[in-house]
Amino acid sequence: MNIRVIYHSSKSGNTQKLAKAVAEELGVRAERMGKDSIVFAQPVDLLFVGDGIYWAKPHRITRRFFEELDPAPIKNAAVFATYGNQFKIGDDLRTLLQGKGINVVGEPFTCKGASVGTKNQGRPDETDLQNVRAFAQQMAALVK
Protein backbone atom coordinates (compact mmCIF):
# COMPACT_ATOMS: atom_id res chain seq x y z
CA MET A 1 0.00 0.00 0.00
CA ASN A 2 1.32 3.44 -0.95
CA ILE A 3 0.94 5.79 2.03
CA ARG A 4 2.15 9.39 2.10
CA VAL A 5 2.26 11.90 4.97
CA ILE A 6 2.33 15.61 4.16
CA TYR A 7 2.03 18.51 6.57
CA HIS A 8 2.57 22.19 7.22
CA SER A 9 4.04 23.24 10.54
CA SER A 10 4.96 26.61 11.99
CA LYS A 11 8.01 27.42 14.08
CA SER A 12 6.35 25.80 17.10
CA GLY A 13 6.63 22.39 15.44
CA ASN A 14 3.33 21.13 16.87
CA THR A 15 1.99 19.60 13.66
CA GLN A 16 5.44 18.35 12.69
CA LYS A 17 5.49 16.25 15.87
CA LEU A 18 2.25 14.58 14.83
CA ALA A 19 3.42 14.12 11.23
CA LYS A 20 6.61 12.42 12.30
CA ALA A 21 4.72 10.13 14.69
CA VAL A 22 2.29 9.10 11.92
CA ALA A 23 5.12 8.55 9.44
CA GLU A 24 7.23 6.53 11.88
CA GLU A 25 4.23 4.39 12.84
CA LEU A 26 3.57 3.53 9.20
CA GLY A 27 7.19 3.26 8.06
CA VAL A 28 7.08 6.19 5.63
CA ARG A 29 8.60 9.67 5.41
CA ALA A 30 6.84 12.88 6.49
CA GLU A 31 7.00 15.57 3.80
CA ARG A 32 6.65 19.26 4.60
CA MET A 33 4.53 21.47 2.36
CA GLY A 34 6.43 24.48 1.10
CA LYS A 35 9.78 22.85 1.86
CA ASP A 36 9.82 19.42 0.23
CA SER A 37 8.96 18.93 -3.44
CA ILE A 38 5.76 16.91 -3.20
CA VAL A 39 4.92 15.00 -6.37
CA PHE A 40 2.38 12.23 -6.73
CA ALA A 41 3.91 10.19 -9.56
CA GLN A 42 2.18 6.97 -8.48
CA PRO A 43 -1.31 6.32 -7.10
CA VAL A 44 -1.60 7.04 -3.38
CA ASP A 45 -3.79 4.64 -1.42
CA LEU A 46 -3.83 6.85 1.68
CA LEU A 47 -2.65 10.43 2.02
CA PHE A 48 -2.33 11.82 5.54
CA VAL A 49 -2.62 15.62 5.59
CA GLY A 50 -1.67 17.70 8.64
CA ASP A 51 -1.80 21.39 9.51
CA GLY A 52 -2.34 23.79 12.37
CA ILE A 53 -4.81 26.64 12.51
CA TYR A 54 -3.73 30.18 11.59
CA TRP A 55 -6.14 33.06 12.20
CA ALA A 56 -9.13 30.67 12.18
CA LYS A 57 -8.21 28.84 8.95
CA PRO A 58 -5.62 26.51 7.43
CA HIS A 59 -2.25 28.12 6.66
CA ARG A 60 -1.87 29.86 3.28
CA ILE A 61 0.78 27.31 2.25
CA THR A 62 -1.74 24.53 2.88
CA ARG A 63 -4.51 26.35 1.02
CA ARG A 64 -2.17 26.92 -1.96
CA PHE A 65 -1.16 23.25 -1.89
CA PHE A 66 -4.82 22.23 -2.18
CA GLU A 67 -5.49 24.76 -4.95
CA GLU A 68 -2.71 23.18 -7.03
CA LEU A 69 -3.40 19.56 -6.03
CA ASP A 70 -4.35 17.10 -8.77
CA PRO A 71 -6.70 14.70 -6.98
CA ALA A 72 -6.50 11.95 -9.62
CA PRO A 73 -3.73 9.84 -8.01
CA ILE A 74 -5.16 10.07 -4.48
CA LYS A 75 -7.60 7.32 -3.54
CA ASN A 76 -8.16 8.20 0.14
CA ALA A 77 -7.04 10.78 2.67
CA ALA A 78 -6.99 11.19 6.44
CA VAL A 79 -6.58 14.41 8.40
CA PHE A 80 -4.61 15.33 11.53
CA ALA A 81 -4.16 18.78 13.03
CA THR A 82 -3.14 20.84 16.04
CA TYR A 83 -4.89 23.89 17.43
CA GLY A 84 -4.48 26.54 20.09
CA ASN A 85 -8.09 27.53 20.73
CA GLN A 86 -10.14 26.73 17.61
CA PHE A 87 -10.45 23.00 17.09
CA LYS A 88 -12.39 23.12 13.79
CA ILE A 89 -9.18 22.85 11.74
CA GLY A 90 -9.72 19.14 11.14
CA ASP A 91 -13.11 19.83 9.58
CA ASP A 92 -11.63 22.63 7.45
CA LEU A 93 -8.96 20.30 6.05
CA ARG A 94 -11.52 17.57 5.40
CA THR A 95 -13.65 20.10 3.49
CA LEU A 96 -10.67 21.14 1.33
CA LEU A 97 -9.96 17.50 0.45
CA GLN A 98 -13.60 16.67 -0.25
CA GLY A 99 -13.83 19.80 -2.39
CA LYS A 100 -11.21 18.20 -4.64
CA GLY A 101 -13.29 15.00 -4.82
CA ILE A 102 -11.00 13.02 -2.51
CA ASN A 103 -12.52 10.41 -0.19
CA VAL A 104 -11.69 11.24 3.43
CA VAL A 105 -11.67 8.23 5.76
CA GLY A 106 -12.52 8.41 9.44
CA GLU A 107 -12.84 11.51 11.55
CA PRO A 108 -10.01 14.07 11.70
CA PHE A 109 -7.51 13.61 14.53
CA THR A 110 -6.99 16.89 16.38
CA CYS A 111 -5.14 17.79 19.54
CA LYS A 112 -4.02 20.90 21.35
CA GLY A 113 -0.71 22.43 20.42
CA ALA A 114 1.48 24.82 22.38
CA SER A 115 0.40 28.35 21.54
CA VAL A 116 0.96 31.79 23.01
CA GLY A 117 -1.92 32.82 25.22
CA THR A 118 -3.20 29.30 25.84
CA LYS A 119 -2.72 26.71 28.55
CA ASN A 120 -1.48 24.21 25.97
CA GLN A 121 2.23 24.35 26.77
CA GLY A 122 3.89 20.98 26.37
CA ARG A 123 1.35 19.80 23.80
CA PRO A 124 1.29 17.69 21.81
CA ASP A 125 2.55 15.48 24.61
CA GLU A 126 3.40 11.77 24.72
CA THR A 127 -0.26 10.83 25.16
CA ASP A 128 -1.17 12.85 22.06
CA LEU A 129 1.62 11.13 20.10
CA GLN A 130 0.43 7.70 21.21
CA ASN A 131 -3.10 8.64 20.17
CA VAL A 132 -2.04 9.85 16.72
CA ARG A 133 -0.04 6.64 16.19
CA ALA A 134 -3.18 4.62 16.97
CA PHE A 135 -5.15 6.89 14.62
CA ALA A 136 -2.62 6.20 11.84
CA GLN A 137 -3.04 2.45 12.25
CA GLN A 138 -6.83 2.74 12.33
CA MET A 139 -6.94 4.83 9.15
CA ALA A 140 -4.56 2.49 7.33
CA ALA A 141 -6.74 -0.48 8.33
CA LEU A 142 -9.80 1.24 6.82
CA VAL A 143 -8.27 1.30 3.32
CA LYS A 144 -6.58 -2.13 3.22
Q: Regions from the language model: what does each represent?
A:
Residues I3-R4, S10, Q16-K17, A21-M33, ...:
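FMN-binding flavodoxin-like domain, especially the glycine-rich phosphate-binding loop
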